[in-house]
Amino acid sequence: MRECISIHVGQAGVQIGNACWELYCLEHGIQPDGQMPSDKTIGGGDDSFNTFFSETGAGKHVPRAVFVDLEPTVVDEVRTGTYRQLFHPEQLITGKEDAANNYARGHYTIGKEIVDLVLDRIRKLADLCTGLQGFLIFHSFGGGTGSGFASLLMERLSVDYGKKSKLEFAIYPAPQVSTAVVEPYNSILTTHTTLEHSDCAFMVDNEAIYDICRRNLDIERPTYTNLNRLIGQIVSSITASLRFDGALNVDLTEFQTNLVPYPRIHFPLATYAPVISAEKAYHEQLSVAEITNACFEPANQMVKCDPRHGKYMACCMLYRGDVVPKDVNAAIATIKTKRTIQFVDWCPTGFKVGINYQPPTVVPGGDLAKVQRAVCMLSNTTAIAEAWARLDHKFDLMYAKRAFVHWYVGEGMEEGEFSEAREDLAALEKDYEEVGVDSVEAEAEEGEEY
């Protein structure tokens, strides 16, 4: 079996975790107490869903997941919520005082007290796996726990499970709305620390998702539940091929092979279609071509940036539901003829396709309509450098005045870490810029220097 362990860190990670596991349970017909009436082989399991759930002798299905937060309130909601019986109490780990939006507290002072306990619990989950494939880590860039503790944990996972892949689902600070003033600091410190430990990081920006909820689902004031359910759908699409049998299946390492041309360029953009409310879906039937085109609309992306200003390096289309390869090929052929979508010249083909016959499931009473087919596109584009540039700019404005730095230094960090992290991100921006340059031009430029 190719099992995956999900690790949900901090408030954002835990709340997205709630949305994801709620959806997985619905998709597989697992009840909130872990029973699965449709599963006939009790205790034994090489069913596809065993990549995400382990089975006990009593026929109970337990998520292969760990929820960690440095303060208890958010995880307490899981402990008392609908799915409280689904998780083993040891999978829900909390500290006593939170990281207070401070990377240094999450990474050094408070994080280090709890990290060994967390690794111990992860080890227990890993021992239940026959062929552990890797880790999915859910966290935000802006919070103290999400930035500091997640990066500490990833460093330690690299030591303990060297070759296992680590994929991140990271909540990127929104351009306009902010939950903390020091988000740029935390984001840049955590990106610098995890850059070498993460194999692939899917970024999600709250504001982009707010806009999708407002525009496509007609929700005037989206709540985090609305956002997380939408993020849950995306995560579900990405992991569907690991949990179901499909026609063209994709596993974790396959994503990296197809999406990551260079180790540092590992931040694909996710786009999901169709995001549509029940009232609208009732009146229209969306074809494969329509949902495929929708993926190339910047409005449907999970991060605010414009791929029309950048170049695509790779593209992964993950379809689910009533989709046949013939339609997909036709849709992609049409897209390739459009001039708005530019690929880098060293990567001519660039489309990888996965098809899963399991139609998308929606949470009953949620905002999303039940549709026959959906697609999630993961694309590695140079446009995401815009997102980094935006963040770096905010970092520079604050750091020029050394604003708020004393909070970090007081927790045992050194100022040098800030400048080191900032230089690393400057290098990352440069990397993206160089990747997008045409290879012929690049050779000509190099020739002049010698």
UniProtKB/Swiss-Prot annotation:
Record-listed Mg(2+) binding positions: 71
Residue list for modification Phosphoserine: 48, 439
Residue positions where N6-acetyllysine is found in the record: 40
Superkingdom of the source species: Eukaryota
EC category: hydrolase
SMART domains referenced in this protein's UniProt entry, alphabetically: Tubulin, Tubulin_C
Reaction(s) catalysed by this chain's protein: GTP + H2O = GDP + phosphate + H(+)
Modified residues (3'-nitrotyrosine): 83, 450
Residues annotated as site: Involved in polymerization: 450
Coiled coil: none
GO MF annotation terms: GTP binding; hydrolase activity; metal ion binding; structural constituent of cytoskeleton
Chain positions found as Phosphotyrosine: 432
Family from the record: Belongs to the tubulin family.
Protein name as catalogued: Tubulin alpha-3 chain
Organism: Mus musculus
